[in-house]
A protein has these predicted regions:
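Short, conserved phosphate/pyrophosphate- and ester-handling motifs at nucleotide-, phospho-/glycolipid
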Residues: 33, 183, 245
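Conserved phosphate-binding/catalytic region of the ribokinase-like
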Residues: 141-145, 192-280
Length: 280
């Protein structure tokens, strides 16, 4: 769950109204895929607290299948406080041993996963607990066993990536994915390259067939099967950029499933991501 001050430049400790919203990269992805017309499901673990119920009700309202969401009384759902400050966005996470981070590999349903077109997971999960890391590895293994595409968004959060091994875990995920959708900055961090062409080449060399680089106001670049398509930036002042990358990644999977041309796919993903920034 995200909690966001409604007043610009307001810090969490300041008095004033705060907006709460069901969030999380994987949940946003699932909702976006559903809104874009694809059947989608969410695999995870929630608590018995009221905010956990808010999350499941949000998923249900967006027609996301929640039949594989486990309810546990072990812990409560994680929180993220988001500040919009003059120096940029700042996250403060309260998710140490949060219930979602305790999903285990043995709690995944192989039959459910085998029936998917693609599975998707964000990189921040790899920085939380041994349990969720094991679940991510099992998700990838089961998907590849059954010919299901693996989609990965590095979604690097500096606040969660203090572990020196974090980069190695991200690289493992890229190497075992069919589709990767980092920002250009994340791609540069993962590859050590600078130019768009070099970043694309280096990421493809790790294994993914489809590489998409988002560039905020400058649009996006998608590369697949030796071809590249560029979507120009859309001139719109963002109200709230939260979820734009997750929505872009969802549109990428939906567009691939629908067999869109590379040029149309780039435009489709870029437009979907841009729509998200027009509201909180």
């Amino acid at each position: 769950v995200d909690l966001m001050p409604l007043r610009e430049n307001m810090r969490i400790e300041d008095p004033g109204p705060v907006l709460k919203a069901a969030s999380g990269a994987a949940g946003i992805f699932a909702c976006a895929a559903s809104l874009l017309g694809a059947p989608s499901g969410f695999i995870g673990k929630i608590g018995v607290d009221s905010l956990s119920r808010m999350v499941t009700e949000t998923l249900r309202a967006q027609n996301v299948d929640i039949s594989h969401v486990i309810v546990s009384n072990e812990y409560q759902i994680g929180l993220a406080f988001l500040e919009y400050l003059p120096e940029g966005r700042n996250y403060q996470y309260y998710r140490n041993r949060s219930v979602g981070s305790l999903l285990r590999a043995d709690e995944l349903d192989e039959g459910y996963i085998s029936g998917a077109y693609a599975v998707h997971f964000p990189g921040m999960l790899l920085d939380l607990t041994e349990e969720i890391r094991g679940a991510c590895v099992q998700l990838v293994n089961l998907a590849r066993k059954h010919g299901v595409l693996v989609s990965f968004d590095p979604n690097i959060r500096r606040e969660l990536s203090a572990d020196p091994a974090a980069r190695d875990r991200m690289l493992w995920a890229v190497q075992h994915s069919d589709i990767v959708a980092p920002t250009l900055a994340e791609g540069q961090t993962l590859t050590g390259k600078t130019s768009i062409g070099d970043v694309l080449h280096a990421l493809h060399a790790m294994g993914p067939r489809v590489v998409a680089l988002t560039r905020d106001k400058d649009g996006a670049v998608i590369s697949m099967d030796g071809k590249v398509a560029i979507a120009a930036g859309i001139n719109y002042a963002p109200l709230d950029p939260t979820g734009a990358g997750d929505t872009f990644a969802a549109a990428l999977c939906v567009g691939l499933q629908e067999g869109m041309s590379l040029e149309r796919l780039a435009m489709f993903c870029n437009c979907a991501g841009t729509l998200v920034i027009t509201q909180r």
